[in-house]
Amino acid sequence: TGVVYSAETLTRMADILTQKSKAFGHNIFLVSDEPYRDIAFDGKTVPYPAAFYPHTLTCFSYSKSLSLPGERLGYVAVRPGCEGEDILVDMMSQISRFTGHNCPPSIIQRAVSRCQKVTSDLSVYQTNMELLYEKLTALGFEVERPGGTFYIFPKALEEDANAFCQKAREFDLLLVPSDS
């Protein structure tokens, strides 16, 4: 939905996870999937969930911030001091091998390693978001204005999202319904 969680929200979430971890007798891991981290609008800063909760795994992909669609190049970071840190790192390495995940070409890895402090011109995403947001709201769609990413999630114009998506097919539009 493009929501950027505030530090206050992440603090509350960390408190809940800590309480529930104690109640269950083991730590609950938070997996923070952050491929769109660098695409934030209106000067927003995206806080790092790992700064709020010690048992966090952070997933990141360079394909969004460097505008490299289709490139599967990124990382999973385990917060230092996370319970089972060594086991988690070893397990992720094994999963990568067992699933047949191949490393990107060396030249791509080398190029990305030199781009750690840069991004593509991400302002185009905000321009596109604003245009789409304005057009959708002008057409009567209920739309939450995203704080980041390049997705907009409008509410269907009729109650049954499946029926709405079927109607859209008549206009050669393929939509995915969601009633959540």
What residue spans do the PLM features occupy?
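PLP-dependent class I/II
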Residues: 1-180
